[in-house]
Amino acid sequence: MEECPICLADDQEGEQFGCLNVCGHKFHLNCIREWHKYSINLKCPICRVESTHLEVGEGQHALSINLKMGFMIKNAIDYVGAETTNERNEDDTGEQDQEIEFLSERLRGTLVMDTIKIIQCSICGDTDVSRLSLYCQDCEAIYHETCLRGLACEVGDRNTWQECTDCRSNALLELRMGAISSQLASYDSRNSMIFAGELRDKHSVKTQQMYEQIRNAKHKIQMHVRRALDRYPLPLLRFKDAYKHVNKQVSRKLYRLSDNKYLPDQYDYDSLARTGVHTELLIYCHDE
């Protein structure tokens, strides 16, 4: 029994199979033509090798279809429909079973060996890093854009091609792996991760994220302090120095109060800023 790797249905469904002339992979005629139409190229969904012809049928009923010129799929099915291919010897069956098993392995998605992750397309398994273009920010699955488009076409919802097939997230970003694009690449997920489209050390990523979170929190807190300062008409000659001094002192107290986090649900920053600014201005003016 032969199974189409795209729709996973077998030849008992009445669908005619076609064989790509370069790589030899077989698919239902409708499935492979729909795949090619939506993926914007003529590459095999399994091995990514481009084929220009699709071979249908055997012997005197054989038909070679030029994929670049297009064809009427119904006419091709009618042409080879009279041929019966029920007789297969044991050797052929064994080879087909092995091929199906191989295809199943290739279509499982990203290979994970303990903590070592292979950088490859999560749909077709291709490991040529130079051709991988998108990755999921949530689960780090990697894809060819053409594979995502093709799969969306096959499931009947073309608007979902920008959705990760592993975790269903819409957080797909551009992948930039040029430095290792000439070789099979892998990484240890305990120490490394894909971040902002690049392979990065996990420690450096966490440090960067922590720094950005603190910086954003401080900026938001400072906005409350500045609004409170703007309520006071300070003398022009002393305005700049007083503004900077009070802003720094009050902001630091609010940073420490919320442990360098911005927690507007727990703290009334406007009220705290007004109180802090008033207190610091009294101290500043007294010292002056």
From Swiss-Prot:
Gene3D superfamilies: Zinc/RING finger domain, C3HC4 (zinc finger). Pfam families: zf-RING_2 (PF13639). Keywords: Cytoplasm, Metal-binding, Nucleus, Repeat, Zinc, Zinc-finger. A zinc finger (RING-type) spans 4-48, 121-168. One of its GO terms (biological process) is protein ubiquitination. InterPro entries: RING-type_E3_ligase_ATL, Znf_FYVE_PHD, Znf_RING, Znf_RING/FYVE/PHD. GO terms for cellular component: cytoplasm; nucleus. It is found in: Cytoplasm; Nucleus. GO terms for molecular function: ubiquitin protein ligase activity; ubiquitin-protein transferase activity; zinc ion binding. Its main location: cytoplasm. SMART domains: RING (SM00184). PANTHER family: ALCOHOL-SENSITIVE RING FINGER PROTEIN 1, RING-H2 FINGER PROTEIN ATL61-RELATED-RELATED. Required for tolerance to alcohol. This is Alcohol-sensitive RING finger protein 1. It comes from Saccharomyces cerevisiae (strain ATCC 204508 / S288c) (Baker's yeast).
